[in-house]
A protein has these predicted regions:
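Short amphipathic alpha-helices and their capping/turn segments at secondary-structure boundaries
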Residues: 13-23, 55, 59-69, 99-110
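N-terminal amphipathic/basic leader segments beginning at the initiator methionine
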Residues: 1-19
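N-terminal small/glycine-rich loop or linker at the start of catalytic domains
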Residues: 23-50, 113-133
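Alpha-helix-loop-beta-strand connector modules within alpha/beta enzyme cores
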Residues: 84-118
């Protein structure tokens, strides 16, 4: 066959009948980057349209996204240098700003799906993903 037949793409009805994959908002996971503080928004230069947000603005962003049908969010903490240690102790502190924010998100928006990562690299002063002695 030298030419691909276009008959299967001629109309929307035919395309929807034979498509193998349909992506909806149920399939999307929105990445969010959490910083400590209040009413701050910092652009992530390498990811246009993505920002580091404080807890108050992150809640508003999640509410907005849920209104659009996006319910799944992957929340990454951005830890200040002063809170990073060789043993990544901030990562397992029960009252950290990250865990407080996750609890607040679930309390205010129980229908949201929050995805987290147990990686230690945001908390370790040497940047390793695991604590090493």
């Amino acid at each position: 066959m030298l030419r691909r037949p276009r008959r299967n793409r001629k109309t929307e009805g035919i395309r929807s009948l034979i498509r193998q994959t349909q992506v909806t908002t149920d399939d999307l996971i929105f990445p969010l980057f959490l910083i400590e503080g209040y009413n701050q928004k910092q652009e992530v230069i390498s990811m246009p349209g993505i920002y580091r947000l404080t807890p108050d603005l992150m809640l508003k962003e999640i509410e907005y996204c849920m209104g659009l049908g996006i319910r799944s969010f992957d929340v990454f903490p951005i830890v200040s240098e002063k809170d990073k240690t060789p043993t990544a102790s901030e990562g397992y502190r029960e009252d950290s700003f990250y865990l407080r924010t996750l609890k607040e998100i679930k309390a205010r928006l129980p229908e949201s799906h929050i995805i987290t990562d147990i990686a230690m690299d945001p908390y370790s002063s040497d940047g390793h993903d695991a604590v090493s002695y």
